[in-house]
Design a protein with these regions (language model features):
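Flexible, compositionally biased loop and terminal segments
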Residues: 1-253
């Protein structure tokens, strides 16, 4: 074992020790950013970058499960990404489909697809649905795969569902408007039956949410990591957890 590996192991153990008895986020959202820039920095194609990034996911989920995280939401494809050049988008969709299938085949985690699959090619949407259906119905760690996902789009879809439900009950728009509460919208979000994310991590150094879970993250803690997603290490994750543990969550109080 090299000296670097020894030092890395020592540092990882110190980080783990610093989390002993400290709060661990129940739900972690992750914006998997930087695949293309990572690839460009070492002379790889964008497709190669996406494949390496997809390969990181299983490893990351193992880290999350190890520390007791219950839910992970992975943002793999935004609605904005759908406007990319057709050849890159086709390759990216295929990589995502293969990655989700591989996650399902491990039999370790319950998978849920969150996003508007109507925006995707039918073969990709069908593959994603099948992978989710074939994953375990229950697991210690549940994984949300956000594909064709945008926070504004999610809220619009939730409002539409609220209006449809009201119409089916014979309510007028005026009656709906007079009694509408934020909880009515929240329960129609893709993750309406899950707790909101406690911690949102974004890799690549970008310090914005770009629409990720904008309703659910109202009281989330944010951690922005300079590392591109393919290079994201266990110590980077543990640092994010340490930063979370050191913060005082006031929840608006």
């Amino acid at each position: 074992m090299s000296q670097w590996n020894v030092l890395y192991d020592v540092y990882e153990k110190r980080l783990r020790a610093s989390l002993a008895g400290r709060p661990i986020p129940r739900h972690v959202g992750v914006i998997l950013d930087g695949n293309r820039r990572w690839a460009k920095s070492i002379g790889f194609t964008a497709s190669q970058g996406h494949r390496v990034g997809a390969g990181k996911i299983t490893e990351f989920l193992g880290w999350a499960e190890e520390v007791g995280v219950e839910i992970v939401t992975l943002w793999m494809l935004s609605t904005d990404n759908l406007s990319r050049q057709s050849d890159e988008l086709s390759e990216l969709l295929a990589i995502i489909s293969q990655a989700v299938s591989a996650l399902s085949q491990t039999g370790k985690w319950h998978l849920r697809i969150v996003g508007d699959l109507r925006l995707l090619p039918e073969d990709i949407a069908s593959s994603l649905r099948q992978s989710a259906q074939e994953s375990p119905s229950k697991s210690a760690l549940s994984v949300n795969i956000a594909v064709g996902y945008g926070g504004r789009h999610e809220i619009v879809e939730a409002v539409r569902e609220v209006i449809r439900d009201a119409g089916q009950r014979g309510e007028s728009l005026e009656e709906l408007a007079s009694r509408l509460k934020d909880s009515d919208i929240a329960e129609h979000l893709y993750t309406g039956d899950q707790p909101d994310p406690d911690l949102v991590i974004r890799t690549s150094g970008e310090q914005r949410l770009s629409g990720f879970m904008i309703w659910q993250s109202a009281h989330s803690e944010f951690y922005f990591c300079e590392t591109y997603w393919p290079d994201f290490r266990k110590i980077d994750f543990l640092r994010a957890l340490r930063a979370y543990a050191q913060r005082e969550r006031r929840m608006g109080k």
